Amino acid sequence: IQRIWNMFIHLNFTSPLAWDMCVITTYLVINGLDIIWLRRGDERKVKMLSYVALPVAILVHSVTAWIFGLEIAKEGWYSAIMAPIFVASACDSGLALLMVVLAAVRKAGVFDCGRELFANLARLLATFIAVDAFFIGCELLTTAYPGTEGASHVLGIMTSGATAPFFWFEILGGLLIPFVLLASAKRRECTGVVVAASALVMCGVFCKRVWLLFTSFTVTNVYGAPGISSGPTAARG
């Protein structure tokens, strides 16, 4: 309790963790108000709240991404495009989960959104997958092209090292295969195909989090303090 209280009275706005706490708290309040007003049937307030909820939802994923993207000492994290990647991943994984839930409640006879809407959502999911793949491609190209020692080490771990299975599953199973399945209008009308593609997308995003997080953890930040080229030995001297 004391630590939580200290976060409020000694809030450090130079830290992305402070931004994350503020945004997530705001998002929780918005969700609480949304549930209350939906139960009361107050559509006007719900509509007004939606104008605030969307940008805050984007900020939730952006600020989480900045916790990683602003880590200058981490070769695989320090990137300006980290926030767009997180937002794109949230869009495709969130919509994929929605597709699975819609298919489940329709099969249970609880709610049917209609085949046309279901197919349109599947097409939107294919678009989100393409955007996510584009951002990841941009990040990989920017990392690989300079050919620096640190970047090459990170890419080696990611593509052929410890986290390679997660990386390749995300690229092939989480992006390529679902996009191919959903690119066809005929296949988008098949509930089983859409559910399978959605499940692959969710697994792919999970694998992305694994290779993104653990690949950079395996790379040493800096040997010795900043400005000391030969490390602890020079510092003692």
Predicted regions mapped to residue ranges:
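Hydrophobic positions within alpha-helical membrane elements
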Residues: 4-5, 144, 213-214
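Short, membrane-exposed interhelical loops at transmembrane-helix boundaries
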Residues: 7, 152-159, 219-236
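Membrane helical hairpin/interfacial module
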Residues: 1-19, 23
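Long, contiguous internal "core" modules enriched in hydrophobic/ aromatic residues
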Residues: 17, 21-191, 204-207
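Hydrophobic alpha-helical transmembrane segments of integral membrane proteins
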Residues: 67, 207-221
